[in-house]
Amino acid sequence: MSTLRPFFIDTDTASDDAVALVMAFARDDINIVGIGVVAGNVPLASALQNALYTRELCGRTDVPVYAGADRPLIYELGTAQHVHGDDGMGDIGLPLTGRAPNEGHAVDALLEASNEYAGELTLVTLGPLTNIALAIQRDPSIADRISRVVLMGAAADHIGNVNPVAEFNMWVDPHAVQIVLESGLPLEFVGWDISRRDAVIVPEEANRLRSIGTPRAEFTIDIQRIVAEFCARDTKLAGFDMPDPIAMAYAIDPSIATQTRHLNLVTECAEGPTRGMVVMDLLGFTGREPNAVVVMHADHSAFIRQLEAAIS
């Protein structure tokens, strides 16, 4: 086995995804074998440019970045540009054009990585699950080759950020979520509830982190400009929350989770007020076997320490 842990990251790169990538790029104990990009927070072309810019900023052009699905399996794409800005990166004037991804499709790259690193690969998903569902449809045996799948998505308290009960990543492509939940993959969910409670960056923390003064530190805070406005106006948080970075922090160091549960999860695919809701059987009413680990609580201080180390 390799001494480095192989990670494949799938992302719809916008402001919080980019910080999660910064955190992964900073690690010397991880081999990022590929980054797949999917439409979600922003259209695919923008998500690609955001990933490529972040890769360049971190000096990690050795890591391949692949274009994936540009739309959900069935529904039309709905983006979160009202949350992250038109460009997904806070609309602060970054030069987000002109970079080309690696040749090949994200789904093919994921399948190849699952074969090359069978039994070792950690898959981290930061966006809609379209690419993952397509990989499962292509080769269901992928479930036997991946060691961990850490997903940013859903919410154990069933509070939503795109409708009353659905988290955005799950809402965008609920049919993909259903395929993933039924796949047998070893799933570990870090939900929006964890982000709202355990990964909120209050203004004092944001100022301190930015004052580290590195390009990565300034980038990490500056691209949250539109997100911070959204959180103050709509989600009523004391600062801005960091869903994808807390998921990445857990993928890197599972001890950041202070409580987890094994639960049965199903999703609502139908259009309507509960589209994209991931129903977690917290009391075991259904009697169905658990199909996922769900993080219930995380250590905010440990998260901040990991983030600070990555941007210093």
Pin down the residues of each PLM region:
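Metal-dependent C-N hydrolase catalytic cores
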Residues: T3, L48-E116, P290-A298, E308-A310
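Active-site histidine-anchored catalytic micro-motif
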Residues: S2-L52, D87, G93-R197
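Short, functional N-terminal and low-complexity linear motifs
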Residues: D16-M23, I74-Q81, G98-P101, I142-R148, ...
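A residue-level signal for conserved active-site and pocket-lining positions in enzyme catalytic cores
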Residues: V65, V180, M248
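Short, mixed-charge, low-aromatic patches
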Residues: T3-T11, P64-D70, M89-D91, T130-I136, ...
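Short, surface-exposed amphipathic charged segments that create phosphate/polyanion-binding patches used
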Residues: G78-G85, N163-E167, E204-A206
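Conformational coupling and interaction surfaces
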Residues: S2-L4, M23-A24, N31, W171-H175, ...
